[in-house]
Regions:
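Short strand-connecting beta-turns/loops that link adjacent beta-strands
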Residues: 62-64, 99, 148
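Short, structured beta-strand-loop surface elements
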Residues: 3-5, 72-127, 133-137, 145
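Short beta-strand-to-coil "C-cap" segments at the C-terminal boundary of structured domains/repeats
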Residues: 143-149
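Extreme N-terminal tail/first-helix region
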Residues: 1-35
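Short coil/turn segments at secondary-structure boundaries
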Residues: 35-38, 131-135
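Short beta-strand micro-motifs in enzyme catalytic cores
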Residues: 40, 139-141
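Short beta-strand segments
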Residues: 36-74
Length: 150
């Protein structure tokens, strides 16, 4: 049984819930009003609620099948809720187009963080602006595909 079998609880912020619905209906073919043309849906499990939460994010990937998710929240003073969820349960599901897969999650620092941060800024240049506008250290998580078990 996967923790992602839990019930889905849409975001209480209507624009996010609508973006998730748009992505799932079109497999990401329609651009996002929030995160642009190249986007993904991150699934986490609520640390307190135990329900599935879904968040539209900028697509940041490498050639090895790994992804990064950046907890910028537009440079807000606090981390997005999904950061707390990933720290509590370092497991994610990610929808990229029509494909949905599970990933192991690692919060990265040092060289790994720098490499992902550079890649992220190539896709979405506002990340440096977000970091400059907040006193918090914006977290970066690497998502590595989970091994498929028979």
């Amino acid at each position: 049984v996967s923790p992602f079998d839990a019930p889905y609880e849409p975001s209480p912020w209507e624009p996010i819930a609508e973006e998730v619905e748009l992505y799932e209906r079109t497999a990401g073919a329609e651009p996002s009003a929030v995160v642009g043309d190249d986007w993904i849906i991150l699934w986490t499990v609520g640390a307190r609620s135990g329900t599935v939460r879904k968040t539209p994010l900028v697509r940041i990937a490498d050639d090895a099948g790994c992804y990064a998710v950046i907890g910028s929240m537009g440079g807000a003073p606090n981390n997005p809720q999904w950061v707390h969820n990933l720290r509590a349960l370092p497991l994610a599901r990610l929808q990229d187009g029509a494909e949905v897969r599970e990933f192991d999650v690692l919060e990265v620092e040092g060289d790994a963080r720098s490499e992902w941060w550079t890649r992220a800024n190539q896709v979405w240049p506002e990340y440096d602006t977000y970091q400059a506008s907040t006193e918090r250290h914006i977290p970066v998580f690497e998502l590595a595909p989970r091994a498929v078990t028979p």
